[in-house]
Design a protein with these regions (language model features):
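Single conserved hydrophobic/aromatic residue that forms the stacking wall/gate
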Residues: 214-222
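Hydrophobic pocket-lining residues within nucleotide cofactor-binding pockets
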Residues: 11, 40, 156, 218-219
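Ser/Thr-glycine-rich phosphate-binding loops at phosphate-binding pockets of nucleotides
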Residues: 16, 154, 214-215
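Phosphate/Mg2+-binding loops and adjacent switch elements
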Residues: 86, 90-180
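Nucleotide-state-sensitive switch-loop elements of NTP-binding domains
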Residues: 2-8, 13, 17-121, 128-132
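C-terminal-of-GTPase-core extension/linker across diverse P-loop GTPases
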Residues: 158-160, 175-213
Length: 222
C-alpha cells in the first residue's frame, strides 16, 4: 500500500522548508514520492517553491480551491484516486494554512482509497516563536497537535525557550480536553542539522486519532 504523510501547521510555520529536507531524504532512499498541495486559494505559492524538487523520483500535484468544502473534498478524493494509479512509494500532503484533519481521515477511509493508501505519519510544524493570541488560535493548534505523531519545532535559535513552548502546547491540548502531554512527541532540532538517522526515526512517528496512538511501520520498509 502507498504510505501517506500529512504535514500540518499554521501559515508560515515552516512546513514547506521541512518538506524540502524530508523529500530529499526520501529520494536518497530511492523512494518515489508525490507531493500533494491541498489549497483553498486560487494560487498556491508553496507549489512554486517546491518546483526544484521535481525529478524522476518526485512529482508535484495540486488540489486548487473554489467552491464549498464538499466540492473541495471531492476534488481531493479524485486527485488521490488518480495518484493511486501511479504506484508511488509515498505521498506527502501539505495543506496551505489551516486544514481539517477529519477530511484527511474521512477521505482515506473511503473506497477505493482505503485499499490503496495507508496513513504513515502526521507531522505538525510549530514555530518556536509561536504566540497564541486567542482561544480560536488555541483550538486550531490543539486540533492539529491532537492528531500528530510528532510535533516538529521550526525556527529554533539560542533564544528558544523549549520548556515554555511545551507548556503552551500542553495548555492548548488541555483546552480541547486532551490530557496527553505533547512532551514525548516533540522533535526540536535546527532543520539544517537533521541527519538521515533523525529522518529514519521521524518516519516511525505515526499518528493519533480518537486519542489512540498508531505507530507507523514505514521505517521498517526502508
Amino acid at each position: 500500500m502507498i504510505k501517506v504523510d500529512l504535514i500540518t501547521g499554521f501559515l508560515g510555520a515552516g512546513k514547506t522548508t521541512f518538506l524540502h529536507y524530508y523529500v530529499n531524504y526520501l529520494k536518497r532512499q530511492n523512494l518515489s514520492v508525490c507531493i500533494l498541495e491541498n489549497d483553498y486559494g486560487a494560487i498556491n505559492v508553496d507549489m512554486m517553491l517546491l518546483r526544484d524538487l521535481e525529478d524522476d523520483k518526485c512529482s508535484l500535484e495540486m488540489v486548487s480551491g473554489s467552491g464549498d468544502a464538499c466540492c473541495h473534498q471531492r476534488r481531493f478524493k479524485t486527485k488521490l484516486i488518480a495518484m493511486g494509479m501511479q504506484k508511488y512509494d509515498r505521498v506527502i500532503i501539505e495543506p496551505s494554512g489551516v486544514f481539517d484533519t477529519d477530511e484527511f481521515f474521512d477521505t482515506l477511509c473511503e473506497d477505493p482509497l482505503s485499499s490503496w493508501y495507508e496513513i504513515g505519519n502526521i507531522f505538525t510544524i510549530v514555530d518556536a516563536n509561536l504566540n497564541i493570541f486567542d482561544n480560536e488560535m488555541k483550538y486550531i493548534l490543539a486540533s492539529e497537535l491532537a492528531c500528530c505523531g510528532r510535533a516538529i519545532i521550526s525556527k529554533i535559535s539560542c533564544k528558544t525557550n523549549l520548556n515554555l513552548l511545551k507548556n503552551n502546547l500542553n495548555d492548548a491540548l488541555n483546552y480541547i480536553g486532551d490530557s496527553d502531554k505533547i512532551d514525548d512527541r516533540i522533535f526540536a532540532k535546527d532543520f539544517n542539522n537533521i541527519t538521515d538517522d533523525d529522518f529514519k526515526m521521524l518516519m516511525s512517528s505515526g499518528y493519533r486519532n480518537a486519542c489512540l496512538l498508531y505507530t507507523s511501520d514505514a521505517a521498517d520498509e526502508l
